[in-house]
């Protein structure tokens, strides 16, 4: 019996499946992560703006959406790296704006950014962003951005890093 439990645990760890997350499309441009309780923007900034952005522009985008009370709320924020990692779906069913397969659950919209900014800073001049293709962490100068870096806003209590 102990061997069987150990075998199941080893397969679970090796495959990286973990416990399946459950997401609900709220029908108002948001998705609820029923495991964490976080509320996510269903699309991302690229869907709306058709451009990438640097970290400072990402903060401005969130401030604008809060002033507009996106989906009825004014407490949206950039996610932490851990929060973005928690969304990762290794089957990569969603496609980015460039057609690359990315690791978002199918309840999220295809056609968005490949990389998403996080609230996490690295020193004074850099901030972290997350690659949805293969669950990659990167950092860049805050004032630099390219066509692939965007924002997927979240609200709720931040995950600790």
Regions found by a protein language model. Name each.
Residues 4-16:
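Bacterial N-terminal signal peptides
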Residues 59-75, 81-131:
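An exposed tryptophan-centered "aromatic clamp" motif
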Residues 142-161:
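Short, structured beta-strand segments at or near domain termini in extracellular proteins/domains
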């Amino acid at each position: 019996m102990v061997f069987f439990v150990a075998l199941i645990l080893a397969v679970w760890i090796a495959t990286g499946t973990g416990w399946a997350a459950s997401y609900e499309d709220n029908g108002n441009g948001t998705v609820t992560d029923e495991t964490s309780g976080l509320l996510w923007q269903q699309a991302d900034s690229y869907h709306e703006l058709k451009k990438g952005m640097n970290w400072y522009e990402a903060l401005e985008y969130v401030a604008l959406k809060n002033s507009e009370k996106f989906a009825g709320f004014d407490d949206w924020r950039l996610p932490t790296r851990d929060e973005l990692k928690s969304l990762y779906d290794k089957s990569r069913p969603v496609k980015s704006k460039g057609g690359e397969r990315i690791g978002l659950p199918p309840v999220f919209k295809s056609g968005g950014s490949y990389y998403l900014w996080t609230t996490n800073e690295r020193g004074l001049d850099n901030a972290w962003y997350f690659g949805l293709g293969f669950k990659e962490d990167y950092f860049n100068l805050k004032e630099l951005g390219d066509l692939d870096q965007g924002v997927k806003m979240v609200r709720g209590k931040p995950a600790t890093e």
